[in-house]
């Protein structure tokens, strides 16, 4: 009812009193209706309007310059002011465009093969095409997939075919499109250097081998750590009364590292004061290691 002829709308903009005398002409037919109020040039019309300036000579010059109004268009029967909705077009199931003009019951009664022959596109076809594209990019072509799964699925065929079909059905990185991997949040990893990590240089400027460990197989166990260990053992042997940290039964020139769980034989001077009594027996006041703490 807003844009009907019976109840016309009011112009939202008010004409300036400093303008020339003007009239409001209805472009779609019918004369404008003058609203009585404070400004007589404030007009009210039913539809879109055009403001024409007139000369000061009079309304005759403006009427001569005004073009003839087109004849009014016939309106559809119904409520005044209501617009007719555009004709709706049915979309096909794939959403790619309007479907054929065949009636609904006819297309619903057709099978997928008949609809495909008629030129329609099914969403199943799109899914198959997308799956074949991904399989082709990852090295698994459609013939290989059909051979693996068989005509009746993974249950058909022998044990080897079922096993290969089960491995093929497992989600793995090989079945993911490489384009999807490159465009995902994880960028493709850079190839690692064949030389490995950059080796640090020692104080003398020579490259240190990463496999140099004391007692390891790298370069026969002769590295910086092995040299330090040999110097340590020589210094320990030179000191008088040093604690023998070698395992029991080991030779003097044995430089093998100590194994976990081996018993150490320490001299009497190197032992720490501890509990001398047997386990379960109370200690006497004069024994070593039973002195009260100074509090």
Swiss-Prot record:
UniProt protein name: Uncharacterized protein DOCK8-AS1
Bias (Low complexity) ranges: 57-67
Superkingdom of the organism of origin: Eukaryota
Signal peptide location: none
Ranges of biased composition (kind: Pro residues): 68-77
Pfam families per the UniProt record, alphabetical: DUF5555
Region of interest (Disordered), residue spans: 1-111, 183-295
InterPro entries: DUF5555 (IPR040791)
Disulfide bonds: none
Positions with biased composition (Basic residues): 1-13
Biased composition (Basic and acidic residues): 245-257, 280-295
């Amino acid at each position: 009812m807003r844009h009907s002829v019976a109840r016309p709308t009011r112009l939202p903009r008010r004409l300036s009193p400093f303008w020339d005398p003007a009239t409001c002409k209805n472009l779609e037919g019918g004369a404008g209706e003058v609203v009585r109020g404070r400004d007589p040039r404030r007009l009210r019309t039913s539809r879109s309007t055009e403001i024409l300036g007139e000369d000061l000579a009079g309304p005759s010059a403006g009427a001569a310059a005004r073009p003839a109004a087109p004849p009014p268009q016939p309106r559809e029967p119904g409520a005044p002011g209501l617009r007719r909705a555009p004709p709706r077009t049915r979309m096909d199931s794939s959403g790619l465009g309007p479907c054929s003009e065949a009636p609904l019951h006819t297309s619903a009664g057709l099978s997928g093969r008949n609809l495909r022959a008629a030129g329609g596109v099914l969403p199943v076809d799109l899914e198959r095409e997308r799956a074949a594209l991904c399989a082709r990019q990852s090295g698994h072509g459609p013939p290989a997939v059909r051979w693996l799964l068989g005509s009746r699925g993974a249950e058909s065929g022998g044990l080897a075919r079922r096993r290969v079909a089960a491995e093929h059905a497992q989600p793995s990185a090989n079945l993911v499109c490489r384009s999807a991997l490159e465009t995902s949040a994880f960028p493709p990893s850079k190839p690692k250097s064949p030389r490995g990590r950059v080796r640090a240089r020692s104080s003398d400027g020579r490259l240190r081998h990463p496999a140099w460990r004391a007692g390891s197989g790298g370069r026969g166990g002769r590295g910086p750590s092995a040299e330090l260990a040999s110097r340590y053992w020589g210094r320990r042997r030179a000191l008088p009364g040093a604690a023998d940290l070698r395992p029991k039964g080991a030779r003097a020139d044995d430089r093998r590292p100590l194994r976990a769980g081996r018993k150490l034989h320490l001299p009497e001077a190197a032992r720490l004061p501890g509990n001398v009594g047997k386990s379960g027996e109370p200690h006497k006041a004069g024994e070593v290691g039973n002195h009260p703490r100074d509090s």
